[in-house]
């Protein structure tokens, strides 16, 4: 049976009752099939799964969708129950931030100011701060994050390593609709026409990956992705489309690489990414 707790004291008591390994899945709610994949991965690796549901105000800018972000706790709880989750921690904002905002934040470093960090200033300060707080209060052995938010996953791994947080970070592959659209809680904002336009993101990534698969160099891979985005369904406005190495460093030439894209579709901002394998120069 899934136990729902709302305070840190209730969480501590519930956590103390879990023997064996504990895996945490941190969410903002509005759970979908992608989250269910995270829950299954956690069940496979850990004796118990703990889920956090918290719409973190620190990671929303003044013009972003904090108030509009979907909140579906009853539905989320049913998904967690079906998945065999042991504990769900769903605090109110003042439970984690009694003074409204923390006095100390986690600085993400240079990578946190690029890509999503450049388009959304302060975003990763808020993300890493809440992740670190939740790691402290949930005390997991493993923490599961989707590769869909690849920059976030990379920064969380760096934070855990640099700050000696005793937890294993596990990345879980992106879940997609049959037509390629990456699952996201924000997809529910899209109209039918916008839903079609959103395929420009995955279409660009697939074109780049296809070019890499036949031996194209980094420049040609990126050019193929840009061409596919521009020729794809109309209605998506590109923010960035880049090719990095697997650690998000610029200038990959061979081996594992990562292509990342962000675009506006109507009033909704979507992100996606895909791994590509660059052939060595002959």
UniProtKB/Swiss-Prot annotation:
Catalytic reactions on record: (R)-pantoate + beta-alanine + ATP = (R)-pantothenate + AMP + diphosphate + H(+)
Active site: 35
Pathway(s) where this gene product acts: Cofactor biosynthesis; (R)-pantothenate biosynthesis; (R)-pantothenate from (R)-pantoate and beta-alanine: step 1/1
Binding positions for ATP per the UniProt entry: 28-35, 146-149, 175, 183-186
GO molecular function annotation: ATP binding; pantoate-beta-alanine ligase activity
Binding residues annotated for (R)-pantoate, in chain numbering: 59, 152
Assigned GO CC terms: cytosol
UniProt keyword annotations, A-Z: ATP-binding, Cytoplasm, Ligase, Nucleotide-binding, Pantothenate biosynthesis
EC annotation from Swiss-Prot or TrEMBL: 6.3.2.1
Localization annotation: Cytoplasm
Keyword Cell inner membrane listed: no
Enzyme's top EC category: ligase
InterPro entries, A to Z: Pantoate_ligase, Pantoate_ligase_C, Rossmann-like_a/b/a_fold
Swiss-Prot/TrEMBL GO biological process terms: pantothenate biosynthetic process
Function: Catalyzes the condensation of pantoate with beta-alanine in an ATP-dependent reaction via a pantoyl-adenylate intermediate.
Descriptive protein name: Pantothenate synthetase
Record organism: Salinispora arenicola (strain CNS-205)
């Amino acid at each position: 049976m899934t136990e729902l707790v709302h305070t840190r004291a209730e969480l501590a008591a519930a956590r103390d009752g879990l023997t064996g390994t504990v895996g945490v899945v941190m969410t903002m709610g509005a759970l979908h099939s992608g989250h269910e994949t995270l829950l299954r991965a956690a069940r496979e690796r850990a004796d118990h799964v703990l889920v956090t549901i918290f719409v973190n105000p620190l990671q929303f800018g003044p013009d972003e969708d904090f108030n509009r972000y979907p909140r579906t706790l009853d539905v989320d709880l049913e998904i967690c129950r079906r998945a065999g989750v042991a504990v769900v921690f769903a605090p109110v904002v003042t439970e984690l931030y009694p003074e409204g905002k923390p006095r100390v934040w986690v600085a993400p470093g240079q990578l946190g100011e690029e890509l999503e960090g450049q388009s959304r200033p302060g975003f990763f300060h808020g993300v890493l701060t809440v992740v670190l707080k939740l790691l402290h209060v949930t005390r997991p052995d493993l923490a599961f994050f989707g590769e869909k938010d690849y920059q976030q996953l990379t920064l969380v791994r760096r934070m855990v390593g640099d700050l000696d947080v005793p937890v294993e970070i596990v990345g879980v592959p992106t879940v997609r609709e049959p037509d390629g659209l990456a699952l996201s809680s924000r997809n529910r904002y899209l109209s039918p026409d916008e839903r079609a336009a959103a395929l420009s993101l995955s279409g660009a990534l697939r074109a780049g990956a296809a070019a890499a698969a036949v031996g194209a160099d980094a420049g040609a891979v990126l050019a193929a992705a840009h061409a596919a985005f521009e020729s794809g369904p109309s209605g998506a406005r590109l923010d960035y489309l880049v090719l990095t190495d697997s650690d998000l460093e610029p200038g990959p030439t061979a081996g594992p690489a990562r292509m990342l894209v962000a675009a506006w579709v109507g009033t909704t901002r979507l992100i996606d990414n895909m791994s590509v394998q660059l052939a060595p120069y002959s």
